[in-house]
Amino acid sequence: MGNGQIIKDAHAKINLGLDVLRKREDGYHEVKMIMQTIGLHDTLTFKRTEDEEIVIESDSGKLPLDEHNLIYKAAKVFFEEIGQAFGVHVFLEKRIPIAAGMAGGSTDAAATFEALNELAGFPCSQEKLMEIAVRVGADVPYCIMKGTALSEGIGEILTALPPVAPANLVIAKPDIDVSTAFVYKNLKVNELDSHPDIDGMRAAIEKNDLQGVTERLGNVLETVTIPAHPIIGQIKACCMANGAVNALMSGSGPTVFAIFDSPVKAEQAAEKIRSEFQLHEVYVTEFWGQ
């Protein structure tokens, strides 16, 4: 049995490419996406306790810390799987923007599965953790896998890809809330003028061709979210006007990420975005592999 304390970094993710192929009869959308973890992360400290309680504390005042938190849900699923023998106290340092389309909750859940597995003496393989993690959320298995991956089906079919070549990123989250359900409900799959070249992007990743990746950035959900929230398009345009190689909305939004060919350009653009749009959640980071 493991014991003591474990500290885990839980990394955010962005979608380099997001395509929706069709709406299935069960109401879910069939997707084809390239997912990528980035340097921006939350930090979680786990302490094993013997009272079989799940206790969560955080430096963020914006999150539920009860059974509605994905950390709690992940702990519950893990303890059910192994037959609970201990409890856990979790402290979450929140750095990933909340409700931003960056899997902030899912990555915290993934870190919880990994830490509890370690504290329990590794009863589950990574494959097993990914299998049970889907009970907590569709993005959680990917957040356990990390790195660069192709995601298909309704997001549950994952294929690991080689790491993307290093790049400097600016992440900017406007101060608005976007409902993922609203975006998918209003997406007109049959009326899309164009689809991102996910296969071409995968080929570029496999050739370590960063330019080929950046010029193929695409997200069909922009067709819904940007008309509803024009500031997203304005932030993208500001990134491009300030030296970005390309820029895209991540997931269902509202976060925008932009790729730069130097850290200096990224820092300058971040400063410009902060001042022009009065944004607090603007970060300079990079692609992050395992």
Report the location of each language-model feature.
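ATP-binding N-lobe of GHMP and related small-molecule kinases
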Residues: G2-A100, E118, F122-E127, I154, ...
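Residue-level signal for inorganic ion chemistry
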Residues: L16, L44-F46, I71, G105, ...
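Hydrophobic C-terminal alpha-helix "anchor/cap" residues
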Residues: M35-I38, A133, C239, I273
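Short, basic/glycine-rich phosphate-binding loops at helix/coil junctions
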Residues: E50-P64, T112, K207-L217
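Glycine/serine-rich anion-binding loops at beta->alpha junctions
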Residues: F91-A120, A138, V245-F260
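Contiguous, small/hydrophobic- and glycine-enriched helical/loop subdomains that border
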Residues: A109, F113-L150
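Conserved, helical-rich catalytic subdomain that frames metal- and/or nucleotide-binding sites
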Residues: M145, L150-N246, D261-V264, A270-R274, ...
